[in-house]
Regions:
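Non-transmembrane, membrane-proximal soluble domains of secreted or membrane proteins
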Residues: 2-22, 45-220, 379-425
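Alpha-helical transmembrane segments
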Residues: 22-50
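Short alpha-helical segments in extracytoplasmic peptidoglycan/chitin-binding modules
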Residues: 29, 167, 263, 356, ...
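Generic hydrophobic, aliphatic-rich segments that mediate packing or membrane embedding
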Residues: 40, 66-73, 270, 319
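Intrinsically disordered, low-complexity regulatory segments
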Residues: 213-380
Length: 425
């Protein structure tokens, strides 16, 4: 069932118990769905009109249904008291001792996570909403003695492995929902409150990353296509016209003054501006939104050999216009590979690619040119801190990453951050 549900990787101490509960619930739902479906179709067949032309007003006379209901109540009581409530108590209610835990504050805002570490003294410094600025997102008072060694990071949570983490979660503006899928932890962030949540990581980020290593077959990249670019047309402008599907290919001028510029859409307002200035003819081309989803698979140069559009570049409007202005009407392109979240896990010296560098469409084309067919890749940041609040694209993009380190690595990182504080004074 876990494989069927495609649950995320697990790096927390109690994650497997949560996964077992999720799997159990789905098995129960599956069995109930089968059972109720069988009962439903049986009832349709058993009590069909042709077999029961006259209604029976007596109904069920046995106590079978009553006992079934009693059995269902007993089963659900056992499920709650023996499984759900103990797991909830162990995983959520029973907090570890503070002296044995890493303690941080995380304050959400539209649209970022601000992480506040108490520093060496273990005390959180004073914060004040009146001190909040772009450079001081939580309004920490650096004049306060407890705040002098406090470390603040943005969308980055560093924590040591094999040690409980207690997070005091809050929000500056609206309700957010902090989620750590790989750590099986999630809690809403409420404005004006600091709500505690906890988990215990048992794998480092590197160990989790090793579990994401996969081989990618470059022959499975989206197919390369020959793309015919839109033609440059000479359009006649008339009052009341709306040519919003067209984009200007040159400046529209009157008496040496520019009225509209190359690259502007010919919407109703711009058409009116042309009419008002007695401009009746312009050169333009149709806009094709599909082109912006494609990437060039080779370099395109002007007459003198200068590169206009490099290989691996999205065909946005500016580049399409540039190609057409240089008499290039056809290009080879493909759809994006959608490997933005991966890094290379090996060196590929023949394509000048080193281990740990980001997978880009340009580098994939370089690998193909070098004759490499299979590559080893892994997730760049396998452990995310995301906003699970279903309130639009801004919340969806409100993501950071978690770096789980050994205690020694964490101590070194913290000392580096503290040194940065001293240097900035």
């Amino acid at each position: 069932m876990r494989e069927f549900l495609n649950l995320p990787l697990d790096a927390s101490e109690n994650g497997y118990k949560i996964d077992e509960m999720i799997a159990l619930i789905h098995w129960i739902m599956f069995i109930l769905a089968i059972g109720w479906s069988v009962f439903f179709y049986y009832s349709i067949y058993k009590f069909r009109k042709s077999n029961n032309p006259v209604a029976n007003y007596t109904g069920v006379t046995t106590k079978t249904s009553t006992w079934l209901e009693v059995g269902l109540v007993v089963f659900e009581t056992i499920l709650l008291t023996a499984f759900a409530m103990p797991l909830w108590a162990e995983r959520v209610v029973e907090f570890p001792a503070k002296e044995e835990s890493t303690i941080v504050r995380i304050i959400g805002e539209q649209f970022a996570w601000n992480v506040h570490y108490p520093g060496v003294d273990g005390k959180f410094g004073r914060t004040d909403v009146l001190l909040i600025t772009a450079d001081n997102p939580i309004g920490i008072d650096r004049e306060n003695e407890d705040a002098k060694d406090d470390v603040i990071t943005n969308n980055q949570l560093n924590i040591p492995v094999n040690k409980p983490v207690i997070i005091y979660l809050g929000s500056k503006d609206v309700i957010h929902s902090l989620s750590f899928p790989v750590l099986r932890a999630k809690h809403d962030a409420m404005p004006g409150q600091l709500i505690p949540m906890w988990f215990k990581p048992v794998k480092t980020s590197l160990e989790v990353q090793n579990e994401t290593i996969q081989t990618y077959d470059l022959t499975k990249l989206p197919a390369t296509k020959n793309i015919i670019l839109p033609k440059i047309e000479e359009l006649t402008i008339s009052a009341g016209g709306n040519l919003k599907n067209y984009i200007l290919m040159e400046n529209a001028t009157k008496d040496g003054n520019d009225v509209l510029y190359s690259g502007m859409l010919l919407d109703a307002d711009n058409v009116k501006a042309l009419v008002d200035n007695s401009i009746s003819k312009v050169k333009a081309r149709k806009v094709n939104p599909v082109l912006q989803t494609l990437l060039t698979t080779e370099d395109y140069k002007d007459a003198t050999g200068n590169i206009l559009v490099p290989m691996g570049t999205p065909l946005i409007d500016d580049f399409v216009s540039m190609l057409l202005q240089n008499n290039i009407s056809q290009v080879t392109a493909r759809h994006k590979a959608k490997l933005n979240y991966f890094i290379y896990w090996e060196d590929y010296s023949s394509a000048s690619i080193s281990k740990g560098s980001a997978v880009t469409d340009l580098s994939l084309e370089q690998l193909k040119i070098a004759g490499i067919k299979n590559i080893s890749i892994a997730l760049a940041t396998p452990i995310e801190m995301a906003c699970a609040q279903l309130c639009g694209l801004g919340h969806y993009r409100m993501r950071g990453y978690v770096n789980i380190q050994t205690q020694e690595e964490y101590d070194i990182w913290m000392k580096e951050k503290e040194a940065e504080l001293v240097a900035s004074e």
